[in-house]
């Protein structure tokens, strides 16, 4: 039974972190559908997705009219619709308290990455329970 992954992190906005692209490639090769949801402006999210993750991430959703920003679930629902995937097959991966809240509001399990915007203690204070210390940990978590 394959669990589909929804990548909600903004890890691509500034640049991709070491090890992220190979992990995303591996997940795609394993059949996972991948998306980015970001509160950054939509055209920039799409452009950065093409620059850093072309051919890997199938949907990139940014701030746009008619779609509420995170932590509302709207962007996640839009991404899932674009991917053609139901929420019960998705996991939200992010690096902030907003991502933890977005996952909760979307009814998705969340993996909080520790190489991004916030540290582990802060994320725990905001409800995070699953952590990836390095990108490879995401694959291990999904294969449990």
Feature map (PLM): residue ranges:
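Single conserved hydrophobic/aromatic residue that forms the stacking wall/gate
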Residues: 1-8, 12-13
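A conditional alpha-helix N-cap/helix-loop micro-motif detector
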Residues: 16-17, 69
């Amino acid at each position: 039974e394959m669990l589909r992954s929804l990548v909600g992190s903004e890890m691509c906005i500034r640049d991709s972190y070491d090890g992220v692209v190979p992990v995303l490639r591996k997940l795609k090769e394993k059949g996972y559908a991948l998306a980015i949801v970001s509160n950054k402006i939509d055209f920039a999210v799409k452009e950065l997705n093409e620059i850093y993750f072309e051919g890997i991430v199938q949907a990139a959703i940014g701030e746009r009219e008619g779609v509420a920003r995170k932590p509302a679930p709207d962007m996640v629902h839009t991404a899932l619709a674009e991917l053609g995937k139901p929420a019960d097959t998705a996991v939200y991966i992010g690096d902030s308290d907003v991502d933890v809240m977005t996952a909760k509001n979307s009814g998705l399990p969340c993996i909080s990455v520790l190489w991004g915007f916030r540290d582990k203690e802060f994320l725990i204070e905001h409800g995070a329970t699953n952590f990836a210390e390095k990108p490879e940990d995401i694959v291990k978590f999904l294969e449990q």
